[in-house]
Design a protein with these regions (language model features):
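Peptidyl-prolyl cis-trans isomerase
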Residues: 219-294, 332
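PPIase-associated folding chaperone regions across multiple families
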Residues: 38-40, 47, 143-216, 280, ...
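N-terminal targeting/tethering segments
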Residues: 37-148
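Short, Lys/Arg-enriched N-terminal segments with co-localized hydrophobic residues
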Residues: 1-13
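C-terminal motif of bacterial Sec signal peptides marking the signal peptidase cleavage site
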Residues: 31-35
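Sec-exported extracytoplasmic/periplasmic mature domains
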Residues: 62-66, 100-119, 130-141, 159-176, ...
Length: 419
C-alpha cells in the first residue's frame, strides 16, 4: 500500500483581486539560500509561436511552494518536495506537471481573448504594475532569486490570472448549469466504520494489523450488531463496543454521463463529518455521483434503507461498516450541493471549450529545461501574516463581485530575511 498524502489542487476560478492579495499579503523568509539560479529567459514551452519562459514557470512553482511549506513541513518534514506522495511522483514533480499544464491553460486563454471580447484595461494594467513593483521592492534579494521574480514576470503572471478570471466568467455564461432536485439531493446517515486490515499512523505511514488485532476489531463489530439486536441505538451500540458512530451526508444522484470505471475527473461533494477517504484496498467503485468518501457497498446499503432503518454488518476486503439512513433529503446539505453541482457543470463546460482550443494548438514542452527547476530550501510564513493574507484575500474576493479592477491597497511588505 502506498504512503499517499493528497496534493492540494490549485483553485481554477480564483478572482483576480484574490490572486493579488494572496500574492502580496504575507511575510516570507527563505532558509539556506543556495544561490543556484536558473536562466529566467530560457524557453520551457512553446504555444504555437509564443515562447513560455522558464522564469515564469519557476515563479509559479515557488509561489505555490511558499503557500504550502508551513503545512507540508509540519506533516512531512523538511525536504518534503523530494518525497513520493502520489503514485511514483514526488511533490516537486507533481508541482512541475501542474505548473506547465496551468501555463498551457493560461496562454491558451490569452490567445483566445478576442473570442469573448476580454481585455485587461489600462487601469488594471496600472494596478498590476504597481502591485508588482511593491512586491519586488518589499522582498529581499534571496526571496526574489529563489522565486526567479522580476517586474516583468510578476506582471505577466498577474495579467494571465486576471485574463483567466475574466475568460472563465465569460465562457460559463453559455453553460447549461441548471440543477434539478434529484441532482442536488443529499441524504444524511450515521455510520460505524471499523478498519480491520490496518490504519495510517500519525506520520501517515500505513500499519498493517496483526491477526490478533484484526480479531479484536471483528469482535467490536459483532458487539455492535449484538447491541443493535437488543434494541440499542447505533450510537449507544458503538459506544458500548468501544468505538464511535459518526454522521455524514452523501449525494444520491447517479450521473449517467460519468464513466463508472474512471473517477479521476470527479469531485467529491460528500461531507462526512469525521471520516477520511477509503484506503486503496477498499472496494470503492464510485458508480454514484460523488461518493469518493464512501465504499460503494455502503452507498448501496443506504439506498436500500428507509429513514431510521439500520443496515446489517457490511464487510469489504478491509473494513466493517454499519449504517443508518437518517434522512433521505438533508435540506442544508442539498442546497450546498446544488451550488457544487452547478459549479461542476460550469467547470465541465469551461474545460470542454478549453480542450477544443488546445486540440487545435501546437504545444511543446522542453523537458530538459523543466528539469532544471529544483528546490533546495523552503519559505516560512508567520501566523500573523498568514491570517492577514487570508482576510485580505477574502475581502478582495467579495469586493471583486462588483468590479473587475484589481486591488492592492491592503497589501503588506514581504520580508525575505534568512532564518
Amino acid at each position: 500500500m502506498s504512503d499517499t498524502i493528497p496534493i492540494l489542487k490549485r483553485i481554477d476560478t480564483m478572482k483576480a483581486k484574490k490572486v493579488i492579495a494572496m500574492l502580496l499579503v504575507a511575510t516570507l523568509s527563505v532558509t539556506a539560500f543556495t544561490g543556484c539560479t536558473i536562466n529566467k529567459n530560457a524557453t520551457v514551452a512553446t504555444l504555437d509561436k509564443e515562447d513560455i519562459k522558464l522564469g515564469l514557470v519557476n515563479f509559479m512553482i515557488r509561489y505555490q511552494e511558499a503557500g504550502y511549506d508551513d503545512m507540508y513541513i509540519q506533516y512531512m518534514g523538511e525536504g518534503y518536495w523530494d518525497k513520493t506522495v502520489s503514485g511514483n511522483n514526488t511533490v516537486l514533480e507533481t508541482w512541475k506537471k501542474n505548473a506547465i499544464e496551468e501555463a498551457h491553460e493560461l496562454y491558451t486563454l490569452k490567445a483566445h481573448q478576442s473570442d469573448y471580447d476580454v481585455a485587461v484595461s489600462d487601469d488594471e494594467k496600472k494596478e498590476i504594475e504597481k502591485a508588482a513593483k511593491k512586491f519586488m521592492k518589499a522582498n529581499s534579494d534571496d526571496v526574489i532569486d529563489e522565486m526567479s521574480a522580476t517586474q516583468e514576470i510578476v506582471e505577466e503572471y498577474l495579467k494571465l490570472r486576471l485574463i483567466k478570471s475574466k475568460m472563465y466568467a465569460a465562457i460559463i455564461k453559455n453553460a447549461d448549469s441548471s440543477v434539478t432536485d434529484e441532482e442536488a439531493n443529499m441524504a444524511a446517515y450515521t455510520i460505524v466504520k471499523l478498519d480491520y486490515k490496518g490504519a495510517y499512523d500519525s506520520n501517515y505511514q500505513y500499519q498493517t494489523y496483526t491477526d490478533e488485532q484484526s480479531a479484536q476489531i471483528k469482535a467490536q463489530a459483532d458487539a455492535v450488531v449484538e447491541a443493535l439486536a437488543g434494541g440499542s441505538s447505533l450510537e449507544d451500540a458503538a459506544k458500548a463496543a468501544g468505538t464511535t458512530a459518526t454522521t455524514g451526508t452523501y449525494a444520491t444522484y447517479v450521473d449517467p454521463d460519468v464513466d463508472k470505471t474512471d473517477d479521476s475527473d470527479k469531485k467529491s461533494d460528500d461531507t462526512e463529518s469525521t471520516e477520511s477517504s477509503e484506503s486503496s484496498d477498499s472496494k470503492t467503485k464510485d458508480s454514484v455521483y460523488t461518493t469518493n468518501n464512501l465504499d460503494q457497498s455502503v452507498v448501496d446499503a443506504l439506498n436500500s434503507l428507509e429513514e431510521g432503518q439500520t443496515s446489517d454488518l457490511i464487510t469489504t476486503d478491509s473494513t466493517y461498516y454499519i449504517v443508518r439512513l437518517d434522512k433521505k433529503t438533508d435540506e442544508e446539505a442539498t442546497e450546498s450541493n446544488r451550488k457544487t453541482v452547478k459549479g461542476n457543470k460550469e467547470d465541465k463546460y469551461y474545460n470542454g471549450i478549453l480542450s477544443g482550443w488546445q486540440d487545435d494548438e501546437k504545444w511543446s514542452v522542453k523537458q530538459k529545461q523543466l528539469d532544471k527547476i529544483k528546490i533546495h530550501n523552503y519559505f516560512t510564513t508567520t501566523k500573523k501574516d498568514a491570517k492577514a493574507a487570508d482576510t485580505s484575500a477574502t475581502e478582495s474576493t467579495q469586493q471583486s463581485e462588483s468590479t473587475n479592477s484589481t486591488d492592492t491597497q491592503n497589501t503588506e511588505a514581504v520580508d525575505g530575511t534568512e532564518n
